[in-house]
């Protein structure tokens, strides 16, 4: 003989009310066979709703046992009970409990989503059920666009979506007018005729008369159990053993959770935007700071490169600001010649400079006249705008050939080409053979005018001195600059007998600037990250509020079969989505800041790196997961009975 469909034995249900315990059900024993139509009648507070919650696996007895087709529910966990509700029970609530953001067909589909049904299959079935119940022209209407009777029919269709072997109707006519109530009871009788087990919970004896069996409960005790007809013979169609598996279309769960998250966000647009604001500001700050740091670093390094790549400058004296450096005359051309023979040296250019008056026609300007070697322009990264540079022969012959910069050209030759023209440096006539492209110094734009001559010409024909103002050494690319610098210092100390000079290693400067910029970027980014954390706390706060506001929705979802993991997933996806949208808007804001920065005359461009953008998205996701987990977990742990009772 097969077991009864539903069997409660020795059931007690006790609740804690302050310091006292309130026993709502007392030693309830009840058996319901498959195919019965049962009415449980009782006054308010009699325990009938608590009994229905236990029958529908929304609650568990405090003491006693509840068997479904012979399976003891006391050993089942929350997800196993959810599967029973999902696949074998259908609920019809007095207040309908439809999800306000979903259409009629969307509400009916919800149980099938959690059952893992394919999208097309569940849509077809939902449409079929609604059409069968006379709502074929209301498929896309939301609950607030439907009458009370129509909303109740939607809840009936939802109860039938996954089969609804057992239909639990809680005061099904309580919120309906008499005509709609009559139609609802006739509909329940039709479902009973189709083989569904119907359990009606009501306080109205007139409603109970539609059932074949009336159970009266008072003060938690069943006081009568009357059958109007014989119990139907139960068919051997056992309830599926609980294995907590997903049947098909598991990916649809994520898609539906994503859709519900979008719906929740669009319903509260302003609140969602304000929640995102902390994330937007934090992400925009981090990305902008990194872009500013990268842009400024690249600008500075480009300026340093203008001093020469992999170069070491040698100057007389004991360091910058040394007043005695002008009296040090030991740096000579032979030092430069000696440095050329070092194996790690690529090229050497001596430097002599002097401030002098330059004349052309009736125009006179004060310029810095630089005596340099032919390698100077390559070492310093100068490029020709017109003309040519001189060569070794010019140095050997003390050639009176000059290269001028663009500022000199603009001063003396604003409308004509200077190539081939003769100018006077002091009293020495020189011919202009080249003009360099405009170039900024490492410290920004310079107003000084520059003319370059062979160092032999400046030393021998103009200033008449046999010592140098400096030497620039270009190293081979494969040589560590610090080691080469020490070798140069050692050689010159041996030649001079004293270290009466100092060196400027451009690579060392570059490395120091890179370290400093990285440190500053990290420091400012750390400050910006604080706003991200504040934004994350804001997300958590709003999500906690959202869970409180949507408690009844969570209860409905649990009643139709949502597992704890389904609820957790939905709220977690919502939190992550809020943060990802905030991250996207933050990155867009960072780019907008870059455009404004460029338009307002910034001295360099903000450079956005793919790494920082990817990191921003990763950070947004992480914040969503970290700060969204607590609200999502709270939602998943709600008791379905308490959640449904919450207004």
Curated annotation (Swiss-Prot):
Its main location: membrane. SUPFAM superfamilies: P-loop containing nucleoside triphosphate hydrolases. One of its GO terms (cellular component) is plasma membrane. Pfam families: ABC_tran (PF00005), FtsX (PF02687), MacB_PCD (PF12704). Belongs to the ABC transporter superfamily. Macrolide exporter (TC 3.A.1.122) family. Homodimer. Part of the tripartite efflux system MacAB-TolC, which is composed of an inner membrane transporter, MacB, a periplasmic membrane fusion protein, MacA, and an outer membrane component, TolC. The complex forms a large protein conduit and can translocate molecules across both the inner and outer membranes. Interacts with MacA. This is Macrolide export ATP-binding/permease protein MacB. It comes from Shewanella sp. (strain W3-18-1). The gene is macB.
